[in-house]
């Protein structure tokens, strides 16, 4: 091989490499957006957002102070960040299709967390999202109210206010963290159960920020605070090894007075109808939260004269909470009654009230003798199996879906 042949080979090789680089750069320029784009929102120029291209629509809007609901934090699993992308969003992705009907797809409905911001866009969102705010709150208290449920109470920053409707929710943001269950402050009366189920052994290690939605237990006239009922999502005691504990619930159970928590909201759709129909509330477990918010709001703020009853299912007396609050409401308001059914009362409970599952008790003790159960409004929140059982029972009585309101936190 002579000198000129070698030089020619090197030159040819270099040319090939440079051609590949040029092709890659050209492709990148087409696939990876750069520069600023304009997002036109709700056909109102005052809402226009000019922002760098390249992110997802959910996070892009959040960076501009527009917080769409997203209980999964943008993972594409909660389907709460629904919006209408009229122009500039490309074709709907397979990860989105299962959350929409064909009619909704034709109407350009999308999940904001799945839509890439590559070019100018025209979108429509619920106007209420413009009122969503974000606060850094402080933990006031975080005490057990039942074996596996804590009441977390947060203080709103001075001068701020959460303008929410009863039945609404907010999103909590947890930073990356590692929490050890053995460090939790668990009330002494509940520690035996935690030890018997081996719960103190768990560790929750989370490497990325987590966002989850929680219904508020307070009602609008309880100012300056936000109150939650949060159940620990520990692995099932007889489940296979390796199931991780719940990311957000583990973190919230570790919180102590003075700790800071980032909250955004308010959001919601689990609102009371403005009618005169009888209201029947059905709850279980941590589903107590929106029940309390609604019932207190109807009676103490609105002074409603609607007939209202609350049916709550618990395992035993140790799992009952807010008992004094509801007893007082029943004493103060002639139009309100509340009932508890225990599914597994303990001998020491000396329980003489209703027993069994709450949907059966509601049916046998009240709805079977009700002249028009189909005319009542039903508001429910509880474990998925409870919700399904109540809905099936109501359907069997001829209650239409429009009269069944569900806060499906476990669905």
UniProtKB/Swiss-Prot annotation:
GO terms under cellular component: plasma membrane
Listed SUPFAM superfamilies: 2Fe-2S ferredoxin-like, Ferredoxin reductase-like, C-terminal NADP-linked domain, Riboflavin synthase domain-like
Location within or outside the cell: Cell inner membrane
EC number in record: 7.2.1.1
Catalytic activity: a ubiquinone + n Na(+)(in) + NADH + H(+) = a ubiquinol + n Na(+)(out) + NAD(+)
Keyword Repeat: no
Keyword NAD: yes
Protein keywords: 2Fe-2S, Cell inner membrane, Cell membrane, FAD, Flavoprotein, Ion transport, Iron, Iron-sulfur, Membrane, Metal-binding, NAD, Sodium, Sodium transport, Translocase, Transmembrane, Transmembrane helix, Transport, Ubiquinone
UniProt membrane topology term: Single-pass membrane protein
Alphabetized Pfam families for the sequence: FAD_binding_6, Fer2, NAD_binding_1
Function: NQR complex catalyzes the reduction of ubiquinone-1 to ubiquinol by two successive reactions, coupled with the transport of Na(+) ions from the cytoplasm to the periplasm. The first step is catalyzed by NqrF, which accepts electrons from NADH and reduces ubiquinone-1 to ubisemiquinone by a one-electron transfer pathway.
Subunit structure: Composed of six subunits; NqrA, NqrB, NqrC, NqrD, NqrE and NqrF.
Alphabetized HAMAP family for the sequence: NqrF
Family, per entry: Belongs to the NqrF family.
Protein name: Na(+)-translocating NADH-quinone reductase subunit F
């Amino acid at each position: 091989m002579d000198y000129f042949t070698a030089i020619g080979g090197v030159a040819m090789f270099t040319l090939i490499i440079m051609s590949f680089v040029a092709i890659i750069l050209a492709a990148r320029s087409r696939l990876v957006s750069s520069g600023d784009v304009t997002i036109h929102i709700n056909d109102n120029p005052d809402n226009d957002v000019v922002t760098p291209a390249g992110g997802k629509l959910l996070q892009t809007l959040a960076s501009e102070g527009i917080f769409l609901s997203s209980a999964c934090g943008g993972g594409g699993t909660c389907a709460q960040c629904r919006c209408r992308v009229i122009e500039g969003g490309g074709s709907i992705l397979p990860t989105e299709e299962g959350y929409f009907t064909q009619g909704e797809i034709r109407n350009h409905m999308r999940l904001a967390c799945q839509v890439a911001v590559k070019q100018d866009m025209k979108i429509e969102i619920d106007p209420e999202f413009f009122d969503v705010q974000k606060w850094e709150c402080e933990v006031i208290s975080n005490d057990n109210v039942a074996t596996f449920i804590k009441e977390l109470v947060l203080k709103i920053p001075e001068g701020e206010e959460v303008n929410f409707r009863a039945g609404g929710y907010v999103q909590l943001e947890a930073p990356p963290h590692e929490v050890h269950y053995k460090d939790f402050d668990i009330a002494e009366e509940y520690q035996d159960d935690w030890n018997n189920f081996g719960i103190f052994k768990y560790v929750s290690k989370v490497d990325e920020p987590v966002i989850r939605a929680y219904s508020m237990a307070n009602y609008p006239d309880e100012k300056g605070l936000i109150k939650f009922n949060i159940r620990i999502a520990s692995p099932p005691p007889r489940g296979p090894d390796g199931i991780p504990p719940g990311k957000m619930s583990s973190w919230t159970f570790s919180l102590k007075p003075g700790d800071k928590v980032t909250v955004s909201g308010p959001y919601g759709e689990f609102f009371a109808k403005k009618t005169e129909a009888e209201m029947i509330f059905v709850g279980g477990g941590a589903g107590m939260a929106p029940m309390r918010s609604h019932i207190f709001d109807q009676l103490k703020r609105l002074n409603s004269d609607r007939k209202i009853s609350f049916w709550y299912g618990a395992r035993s007396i140790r799992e009952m909470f807010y008992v004094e609050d509801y007893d007082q409401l029943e004493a103060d308001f002639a139009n309100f009654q509340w009932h508890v059914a225990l599914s597994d009362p303990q001998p020491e409970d000396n329980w003489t009230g209703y027993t069994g599952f709450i949907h059966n008790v509601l049916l046998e003790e009240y709805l079977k003798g009700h002249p028009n159960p189909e005319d009542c409004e039903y508001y429910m929140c509880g474990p998925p199996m409870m919700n399904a059982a109540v809905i099936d029972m109501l359907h069997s009585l001829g209650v239409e879906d429009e009269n069944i309101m569900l806060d499906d936190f476990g669905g």
